[in-house]
């Protein structure tokens, strides 16, 4: 029988006897915490429940717009998410590529289904963002323990993003997208819907067409052409069971009474998107792009989006995907490089960041100041805050007080080569690659709840 030797309790007193000058700075005192006597932090009484929102306008289908009204049945809105049933898709045997034709959904399918979404109070837009922001927010904020589940939620699964020919089928599937509106960031900035009787609160959505989401590719020469309804067994597909949900919190009568009578300022985050710029590595290897934002900017997202094929979404690299061995879609990680070599951020003709390599924005910045490091190539961020995930002010720059802010990029060598095209079938740049430069920002702003309405005291 194996014997187990332990330690005498007396030996622990030897550790305690080493208390000296340095320990006086580390331990003890009136404010010291006793780790073996837990203090309970009480909260006000509440309950929460999921609520399905009612559509008030439009049609929730491909290439359509629609909106939903936020219910006032609860007191606070904690978060929101959208669900959709993606239809089964089957390629015709006599499609335009015949036996060589394959179809698959683009990466980040549910991100890219949302062309644009906004939160509106009557006609005042409080927040608005596009699918590109969903890509970047997930890349830099999604911790590893949730990333696999999140990919399942938005359609990044083998059965959806790997090619099938006319003998197979893309399955019908229910997808879920958490919507990162400002009120979902923390329960402390939950939307006090019960205190806004004079505002109609709406969530609006503009959805992409299926032709911008479904990749139709030749499995031998990797040619990509736009899909049409005539290529599909069931014709033009339609979305099913599109639903928008929120989590409502219900509080006590006393707290509800105070909500309606006490003015309140809420520090929130908003998203700004700069106009997109054409990125031309062959003719302009060191482009300079103006950045025009306002308010207290805490975080910049930027990258070069590959726009060669309309249906190939969420591609921020120098190459287009190919099909290997006539069966597997590949992003060619060894060929599909970052289009950006380095970036200089300029304030009023002075370099704020001078020729910092792309790895600084893709790896170093998110390692120290982000929520996670992107797995995919081509994502960049610069964070003025000490922690991009913290709602409290921890650093920002007021772009409204700056003039002539710009980003100067140095194009990577592979971006120059691939922009010329002419590669082999499996090169990823058989066609000349086209690009556009994207810049987004997250800023602090203040929402004021007063007299039953929402407004911005600082516009």
From Swiss-Prot:
MF (Gene Ontology): structural molecule activity
Pfam families named among the record's database cross-references: Capsid_N, Capsid_NCLDV
The UniProt record lists the keyword Nucleus: no
Key words of the record: Capsid protein, Late protein, Virion
Record's keyword annotation contains Glycoprotein: no
GO cellular component: viral capsid
SUPFAM superfamilies to which the protein is assigned, alphabetical: Group II dsDNA viruses VP (SSF49749)
InterPro entries noted in UniProt: Capsid_N, MCP_C, MCP_C_sf, VP_dsDNA_II
Subcellular location as annotated: Virion
Family per record: Belongs to the NCLDV major capsid protein family.
Function recorded in the entry: Major capsid protein that self assembles to form an icosahedral capsid. Represents around 50% of the total virion protein mass.
Subunit structure as annotated in this protein's UniProt entry: Homotrimer.
Stated name of the protein: Major capsid protein
Gene responsible for this protein: MCP
